[in-house]
């Protein structure tokens, strides 16, 4: 009997350096949870940009109102719905201290990316602006990495960008994510220790929704 599989769009991969020994990294669930939350927030940003494509690409409007502040409100709501964490009140949330430090920095990087594209987004008389989720995600991740040295990427098999091509471990993770028995709810992840125990790699699956098929 053929095993049923589910199509996946790819995975988010996060390399989080924490300078611990190999055994300590495995025991440090805080590092893994921080990586998971960062992946969910980054994906929430991509989803938000995707949901606003009709507005962004409307040639009849000048000022779209899709400001960094408007983006922040939407992505904060989406992240709260998915991760059950309120970015506006992180001090009261039961999340790792590392996450309390890094989540606002990722949000700032995403807002800065939206700010950079304001002249493009608000250009009248032009349809497609090129400000798509992939572009947003790459540039926001680069800004975040420059400030924190935490590396984020989205990969798939095959990958459109050779620089983001999955390695053997990521290919195996994607195969596991594609199994019909793998949970589709709860933002489940796969993690491993890398760089001689100095960092942890966290992978979050991205599944195709009905609207993508």
Where in this protein do the model-derived segments appear?
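Extracytoplasmic c-type cytochrome modules immediately beyond a signal peptide or single-pass transmembrane anchor
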Residues: 24-207
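Short intrinsically disordered, low-complexity coil segments enriched in acidic
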Residues: 1-2, 17-21
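Bacterial N-terminal signal peptides
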Residues: 9-19
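Bacterial N-terminal signal peptides that target proteins for export
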Residues: 1-11
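Detector for the c-type heme attachment site
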Residues: 212-213
